[in-house]
Design a protein with these regions (language model features):
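Short, membrane-interfacial amphipathic segments enriched in basic
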Residues: 1-15, 206-217
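Transmembrane helix-boundary elements of multi-pass transport/secretion proteins
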Residues: 2, 6, 17-94, 108, ...
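Membrane-interfacial helix-loop-helix junctions in multi-pass membrane proteins
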Residues: 20, 58, 192-230
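Pore- or pathway-lining transmembrane helices of multi-pass membrane proteins that form conduits
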Residues: 29-35, 171-194
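Transmembrane helix-loop junction
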Residues: 43-48, 103, 134, 168, ...
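Hydrophobic transmembrane alpha-helices
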Residues: 71-81, 179-190, 207-209, 213
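Short helix-to-coil transition segments within interhelical loops
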Residues: 99-106
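Alpha-helical transmembrane segments and their short interhelical loops
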Residues: 107-181, 185, 230
Length: 230
């Protein structure tokens, strides 16, 4: 099969996801409001704290809002990966998935195209969040807006693949919505998104190992150090 056919298929799937995202305005606003609520309310509760140290020997502190911003970026990608997979379950129940499966394009290419389309949408959400987060004085270096892109692609692929795996195992829409919340919140809270690992190690050793082996922690840390060019 010619390469142009694959490219047209990929373009069609990406445009379909982009149009769905544009038409679902509540999805866009919820994707931004959710991390902004965390940033505006949760960070305000820790504003009295001098800061958080993340680089050994843990003597240099940064504001807490600056610390949790990468974790909130990863949260955007986590929710978007799950919601993109939720749309797959919806398409399967409504029967629209059959129109894609009857095409001569291999199914693995359809899945990869769907995954990359979700990553593209999540990156748009992240950059929109970074623009609004500047109101909280979260302004990374100019180079950070470029160096964060590979980290966003890798973490988006990882989190999107997790959601796609769940959507392939769970056939009903209602069951997937429940399992989605069961997966999202433990992954988010048991990571370095809100607290540095060395602080967690001081308070609970078993929780430290849970956070250390949590794949979401590595997504957060890759985003953090690429965003701030460190």
């Amino acid at each position: 099969m010619e390469l142009i056919v694959y490219l047209r298929c990929f373009r069609g799937i990406v445009l379909r996801e982009a149009l769905r995202f544009v038409h679902q305005k509540e999805r866009f606003f919820s994707a931004l409001v959710r991390p902004l609520v965390w940033l505006g309310i949760f960070a305000a509760g820790f504003r009295s704290v001098l800061g958080v140290a993340i680089i050994p020997p843990y003597e240099t502190y940064i504001p807490y809002e600056v610390y949790i911003a990468p974790g909130l970026i990863a949260m955007i990608q986590l929710f978007n990966g799950m919601q993109s997979s939720l749309s797959m379950v919806y398409d399967r129940e409504m029967g629209s998935m059959k129109t894609m499966l009857v095409s001569p394009i291999p199914r693995w290419f359809l899945l990869i195209s769907k995954l990359l389309a979700g990553v593209f949408v999540s990156i748009l959400q992240v950059y929109a969040f970074l623009i609004i987060a500047s109101l909280w004085d979260i302004v990374p270096p100019v180079s950070g807006y470029f160096t964060i892109l590979p980290a966003l692609i890798i973490s988006g692929l990882m989190l999107g693949s997790l959601g796609m795996f769940l959507s392939s195992a769970i056939k009903q829409l209602e069951n997937f919505a429940g399992v989605m919340n069961f997966v999202i919140f433990p992954m988010f809270f048991a990571s370095s998104a809100l607290y540095p690992l060395w602080k967690i190690e001081e308070t609970s050793e078993w929780l430290y190992y849970v956070c250390f082996y949590n794949p979401f922690t590595y997504a957060v840390e890759s985003i953090r150090f690429s965003l701030y060019s460190q």
